[in-house]
Amino acid sequence: DTSAAALAVLRENAARAGASNIRAVQDDLFFMRPKVRYDAMVFCFFGQTGETLRAVRAQCAGRAFLIKRGHAEHRFSLTNSPASRLNFQRACAELTALKVPFFTETFSAEMGQPLRSLPDAERFFAQFGTSGHPPDTAQIQARLTKTGMPEFPYFLPAKRMLGMIVLDARDIPDSI
């Protein structure tokens, strides 16, 4: 990752869990070359298929796990706006076309957003919504659930389908 703050949280959580086999690296993934290839790599909502495969081929000696969105709509829009990012189905089609063997698993996960107040919810939809219209307060309130927690009294649920692609770095052709 390139975020020092995010990596500090990861390091802290790994230390607290006693996970000595996790190493957080702050670098540019596409240019770094480890002295020893990683046993495994995990890419969660990260990268286009070709660039991910090139990074795996250069840096990994074992399996790579690619977590991709399995849904086609933007999760924080008040309308059913299509998501613009690459998704699970497209990544599988690209791997098949490249003749890279893989297996998959699909699952659902809650990917919602906690919110501190109704005005925060309105700002959130204004910033991340894709409809191009000002957010409608009644529509927003209809989508929120109350949590009973003082710090985040509202939650915008967003249960989404995800897909995990598992492949072996040794199966990635040099031509990619």
Regions found by a protein language model. Give the residues of each.
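A short SAM/SAH-binding and catalytic strip from SAM-dependent methyltransferases
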Residues: F30, Y38-R54
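Conserved Class I S-adenosyl-L-methionine
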Residues: E105-I176
